[in-house]
Swiss-Prot record:
HAMAP family: RecR (MF_00017). Pfam families: RecR_C (PF21175), RecR_HhH (PF21176), RecR_ZnF (PF02132), Toprim_4 (PF13662). Keywords: DNA damage, DNA recombination, DNA repair, Metal-binding, Zinc, Zinc-finger. Residues 81-176 form the Toprim domain. A zinc finger (C4-type) spans 57-72. The gene is recR. The keyword Glycoprotein does not apply. One of its GO terms (molecular function) is DNA binding. SMART domains: TOPRIM. May play a role in DNA repair. It seems to be involved in an RecBC-independent recombinational process of DNA repair. It may act with RecF and RecO. It comes from Photorhabdus laumondii subsp. laumondii (strain DSM 15139 / CIP 105565 / TT01). GO terms for biological process: DNA recombination; DNA repair. Belongs to the RecR family. This is Recombination protein RecR. It comes from the Bacteria.
Amino acid sequence: MQTSPLLESLMEALRCLPGVGPKSAQRMAFHLLQRNRSGGMRLAQALTRAMSEIGHCKYCRTFTEQEQCTICANPRRQQNGQICVVESPADIHAIEQTGQFAGRYFVLMGHLSPLDGIGPMDIGLDRLEDRLATEEISEVILATNPTVEGEATANYIAEICVQYGVTASRIAHGVPVGGELEMVDGTTLSHSLAGRQKITY
């Protein structure tokens, strides 16, 4: 079946989004054209502006339109002395929603993966090392993902922290709140047991 070249182009473009296959892209394209053209125009304008104007914070590497993101520019955050290392800007958003962290961040934009040719320089560890050398940092909280690559990356950064006399800590991983032990996989349960905490009264 032949369709409009522009429609085909739209569907192909939508497929660059994660989890969007041919059918989903087709549904989205037809919905925008058939029922929500104004929404499609807003999406196009927002996407164009975001792609052209959003860059990276020169300190933590998260997404921002400014040279420095709002978190790094906050004087209270600067005085905290803690840096939380994450793999992506999305992780910052998740941690900020908890309201439990008052320090600053450093975004790796990935993790170490020798098999894929991704080394320390590719994830900005030279810039993190510069911060450890020049800023008054008391603790680096390693919040990389609980994967083989994430653990390897955390261990590598912890070794760098030792060289600068900075405390390195790892976020806890374990049984989710409301979860049942019999449904939890062995690896997660092992992390839970290893990261157990003493109950004090």
